[in-house]
Amino acid sequence: MPSTWLAPAKINLFLHINKRRKDNYHNLQTIFQLLDYCDKLTCTITNNGVIKRTSGNKSVKQDQDLIIKAAKALQQYTGTTLGANLSIVKNIPIGGGLGGGSSDAATTLVALNQLWDTKLTQAQLMKLGLNLGADVPVFIFAQSAWAEGIGNILSPIKTPDHYFLVVFINKHISTKEIFSHYALTISEPQGKIANFSELVNTHNDCLQVAIKLEAEIGVALEHLNTCYNRVGQARMSGTGSCVFNEFLTEKDALAAAKKVPKKWMSFVTRAINNSPIYNWAVAKR
């Protein structure tokens, strides 16, 4: 019987790059804010051990799809003889800095761990997920979080029940190109914050490089900064190319959305502190 699971988007409320590591990753500090804007994964368990994608983004080859990689990683790690047919409905823009691929992989791991009854703990799933991508663990953690390390050292954080207008300029920014760019800003690490209200002097160290690579990001930010009733300045999520405004009410966010140029994709979404997969994740801690 098919089982359907949600994979939420995230935004980075800020992103400070602290240090380039010997493994070519970067130490960073950020807040991952989960959103109620989701991809939808449907799993059908099989007895033949075969893992395949039955529908989804055809522009991504099956063997390169993170949901397939995640399923095969869990299968190999646990030794299960079960298989799965996986179908994904993509809503989260690809290559926009919203973590869609990582979230899909995380939901795949959590879902199949439950459906295959492989009994891995959340910590084990997070370790397995880290091999698939630095952002995968936070989606298995299943809570909005203060993050350090390469984004894998996580502490839950409660954020306000605000709304966001997210704009995707329909252009992909290469994370690898951002982090290898000569102009990437490095910030001094801040002390760990105890609550959201302690955020001061935050920014996104990737922003100026992203604008150098794709000037339209700057244009989108300028547009968002003309919106009424926004909370603070418009920001970029992750390494881009999505930018966003924060609002106290859905009404204000929807009013701003009506003025977004039609050439860009946009959506209004709400901040959530717990992921839709939170209950399954905590059951396996």
UniProtKB/Swiss-Prot annotation:
The active site is at K10, D135. Its EC number is 2.7.1.148. The keyword Transferase applies. One of its GO terms (biological process) is isopentenyl diphosphate biosynthetic process, methylerythritol 4-phosphate pathway. It is an enzyme of class 2 (transferase). The keyword Nucleus does not apply. InterPro entries: GHMP_kinase_C_dom (IPR013750), GHMP_kinase_C_sf (IPR036554), GHMP_kinase_N_dom (IPR006204), IspE (IPR004424), Ribosomal_Su5_D2-typ_SF (IPR020568), Ribsml_uS5_D2-typ_fold_subgr (IPR014721). GO terms for molecular function: 4-(cytidine 5'-diphospho)-2-C-methyl-D-erythritol kinase activity; ATP binding. ATP binds at P93, I94, G95, G96, G97, L98, G99, G100, G101, S102, S103. It catalyses: 4-CDP-2-C-methyl-D-erythritol + ATP = 4-CDP-2-C-methyl-D-erythritol 2-phosphate + ADP + H(+). Pfam families: GHMP_kinases_C, GHMP_kinases_N. Gene3D superfamilies: 3.30.230.10, GHMP kinase, C-terminal domain. Pathway: Isoprenoid biosynthesis; isopentenyl diphosphate biosynthesis via DXP pathway; isopentenyl diphosphate from 1-deoxy-D-xylulose 5-phosphate: step 3/6. Keywords: ATP-binding, Isoprene biosynthesis, Kinase, Nucleotide-binding, Transferase. Belongs to the GHMP kinase family. IspE subfamily. Catalyzes the phosphorylation of the position 2 hydroxy group of 4-diphosphocytidyl-2C-methyl-D-erythritol. This is 4-diphosphocytidyl-2-C-methyl-D-erythritol kinase. The lineage of its organism: Bacteria, Pseudomonadati, Pseudomonadota, Gammaproteobacteria, Candidatus Pseudothioglobaceae.
